[in-house]
């Protein structure tokens, strides 16, 4: 959804009609980021999914147990992708289908193994989710107000060190997290989340 202005219901429907027509016959996945001017409620997702069958998935921040319960009707017709830091609770107790994963930015292999653990040992995966949330909050809090989510994801990938040549560079006009912050971030993530780097 357009994130720069809060659409009213009529505008939102008009936007979806045009996007779906332009994408036809390919179905769409809609991103409603947590920083958008309008965050759709679970009942609104249910109404939209009933009206637009070409909408097959959504990328949203996720929520608590109440949010997941309220999202269940919409999740019958939509794949619900939540933030990677909420994937275990979303899969184990909620209606999540998967995630757009900031955890995978940090460690793709670790994120895959953690997702497998959600199915094989959900209690451990839920404990690890709490660790992930705490470490991410502590490590990234100095940067959240000054840098975009894109810059944070690039810093996560660079800190993870899982591929040669990764840098914190982002496209103009975004600002990058300074390269000299990466060593400290990498140390925090590896010390706090060793199971993602085994």
Features from the language model and the residues they span:
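Catalytic alpha/beta core domains of metabolic enzymes, predominantly
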Residues: 18-26, 33-146
